[in-house]
Amino acid sequence: MNKQVNLILILLISVFSFAQNTDGYTLLFQEEEPLKIKLKYSNKEMNKKTNDSTFIETQLSYEDAGVWKDVDVRLRARGNFRRNTCYWPPVKVKIKKSAAAGTVFEGNKSLKLVLPCMMEPDKNDNIMKEYMAYKLYEQISPYHFNARRVDIDFTEVRGRKEKSHQIKGFLIEDDDIVAKRFEGKVVDRFIHPLAMD
């Protein structure tokens, strides 16, 4: 526990000690405060009915200055291992340009939503460790993905019943935005895990 507290303190000190240049960041990633969002969908449907080209449609609600606003989004489960292993798989969020216009999501057509793997209470701690790794990397490298913490009020649809969950997660910006910011390009390339050092 002491190690976690020390790591959090070091991260907070480094975040507030170094001024970050937010030029090129979308509005969503210019703030450090956790974004409160609400999502409602069937986890079972997400796992079984979505793939690289098939999405489910829903609304993402977010709090902006005390007022809840809605954005139409399309969602799909990501990843093979987590999709088969986790209760909540990571989610790819697609937002139409017209739906994102004038919202905190403007400029973000595609985001990754990282969620805890399991429903156990301490799993929120694990997701926060992963988030801290992203934030630490922002401090030590000029080439990084921006991440924004989210507090999620998730309503899981289970047939005719609904179950509410309070979970923590974070959003990661799309690789196309990162490539544009650093004047690079995204290269889709499969590298077998055994070929890596």
Feature locations, PLM:
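Bacterial Sec-dependent N-terminal signal peptides
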Residues: 1-21
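Phosphate/dinucleotide-binding and metal-coordinating scaffold of catalytic cores
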Residues: 20-197
